[in-house]
Amino acid sequence: MREDTFFFQWWFLVSGLSFIFLLPQAFTYHTPPINPCFAHPFLPPITNPRLLKAFTALQAWKFTITSDPNGFTSNWCGPNVCNYTGVFCAPALDNPYVLTVAGIDLNHANIAGYLPLELGLLTDLALFHINSNRFQGQLPKTLKCLHLLHELDVSNNKLSGEFPSVIFSLPSLKFLDIRFNEFQGDVPSQLFDLNLDALFINDNKFQFRLPRNIGNSPVSVLVLANNDLQGSCVPPSFYKMGKTLHEIIITNSQLTGCLNREIGLLNQLTVFDVSYNNLVGSLPETIGDMKSLEQLNIAHNKFSGYIPESICRLPRLENFTYSYNFFSGEPPACLRLQEFDDRRNCLPSRPMQRSLAECKSFSSYPIDCASFGCSPPSPPPPPPPPPPPPPPPPPPPPPPPPPPPPPYVYPSPPPPPPSPPPYVYPPPPPPYVYPPPPSPPYVYPPPPPSPQPYMYPSPPCNDLPTPVHY
């Protein structure tokens, strides 16, 4: 055998053995870990079909989780999904004898991962709270199968994409919170036609204008802050929300225009915050009709004029912040509030105000609220009446008059003549004494006895006639 041939065979044999020796290690390194929930072949079967679907959904979700530093999902194993951390079971609405997964609450768990399509299997879910985590991606479209979902809170995550249109397929939804995410683009106007109680879409990257139908929303809390409203003004329909709206926050959202006097119709408001915008004009005096108002923040705008006194006399107002504007007058009632901030205005005799040149420069440009395309606002409130002029100095006192003559003393009248003694009337006559009544009535004597009847004498028997016999 040739030497080169022998060397080739020997090299091939050694190389093959090395490859065979290293092959298991290579494949073992790339093999995914075995899910411990399926490592036991003798798990009891799940006879409840609804809990079986929930088991499938939760195991698929756990598989997408990339980080769980606090171990919230460490016990998501086995068929008893009702014992999983953050999973809550309750009797089904259509069958109280069947147990279902009715709620998921993983708030503040700091979990990283994605939301899988299998979440659509949780058809009995009424509450889904996963705020303050690190979930990425988009809301799965399969959430449209959750017809019983009442509350959806995915706030403070890293969700992205356009506004999740799956929201419009949830007929039972009342509470929607998608704030502090990375959603972007337009906000559909039909969002404000939904029958919601609370709506939070603040602190995203939305770019939209306030729609004309915003007044159709029956929400009690509306937060749109820290988005780009693209210079939109407040639509007239906004003031139709007076019966339900309690809190509205639209800070730092490029809001422009003037506030209409109809804002006083929002008489249920407790919080009104439109700070850090480009609102102009004067404050409507009708804000004084919002008797429930507790927090009023209009700072960092371009309001001007005189602050109506009725605002500062609201019975429940605790904090009124109107700093960084161009107000030129404030009533003393504002200075008696529990908390107020009037810095950086044009208020005379108040500390920390704008310079006189800055105030004159701003007032040299007239404000035309109609130019913003909003409904014409009410005329600005009249300035307070000037203080009355000081009274004129009193005239010098006149010279003292001469002393009056002594009063004339009339002589006393002569004494009246003595009056005659009073007439003494004679005593009245004695009362008439009537004579006594007559004696008893006269008693007549009895009549004399009547005379005896006269008896004629009978004739003698001899004088009788003799009867004649025939």
From Swiss-Prot:
In the record, biological process GO terms are: cell wall organization
Q: Where in the cell is it found?
A: Secreted, Cell wall
Q: Which tissues carry this protein?
A: Expressed in roots.
Post-translational modification (record): Hydroxylated on proline residues in the S-P-P-P-P repeat.
Indicate the principal place this protein occupies in or around the cell.
Answer: secreted
Q: Identify the stretch(es) annotated as Contains the Ser-Pro(4) repeats.
A: 378-470
Q: Where is the segment annotated Disordered? A: 378-411
Identify this protein by name: Leucine-rich repeat extensin-like protein 6
Q: Which organism is it from?
A: Arabidopsis thaliana (Mouse-ear cress)
Q: Organism classification, top ranks?
A: Eukaryota, Viridiplantae, Streptophyta, Embryophyta, Tracheophyta
This protein's encoding gene = LRX6
